[in-house]
Amino acid sequence: IYNFLYLTNQGIDIVRIDAVPYIWKELGTTCRNLKQVYTIVRMMRMIAEIVCPGVLLLGEVVMEPEKVVPYFGTVEKPECHMFYNVTTMATTWNSIATGDIRLLKKQMDIVNQLPKQYVFLNYLRCHDDIGWGLDYETMRPWGIKEIPHKRYLNDYFTGKSRI
């Protein structure tokens, strides 16, 4: 909390919380989605609302948008203000490489069905690599196989192949 308050006092407007599901560690667990995570993020939101109400909490959760929903909290107990839309980033690059927007459209339709107060930050690149964690369950009936498809994407973006 000290660093959080220090940074907000320096004038930052957005605090990025990296790898939200893993911010609480406990031996003997996967350290993912432990109940303490929600308590910590809720506490940060409460502090922000009292001490620095103009500051937004931007979370990073590498999951599909519909699985990120619990990290927004509830109307009564809000947590993060917004989240990176990691899935759409990878799906956008997939659409560029393949010329196929079906998966991107499906994901945008899902996001558009979520409550309007759930805000996602769409972006095209970050400091991490692009993980090809695409929705292969949806893509399978379209004749797309995961391993060859990932190989194609890597080859495409390294200049080894084209559509």
Regions found by a protein language model. Give the residues of each.
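Active-site and adjacent substrate-binding regions of carbohydrate-active enzymes
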Residues: I1-I163
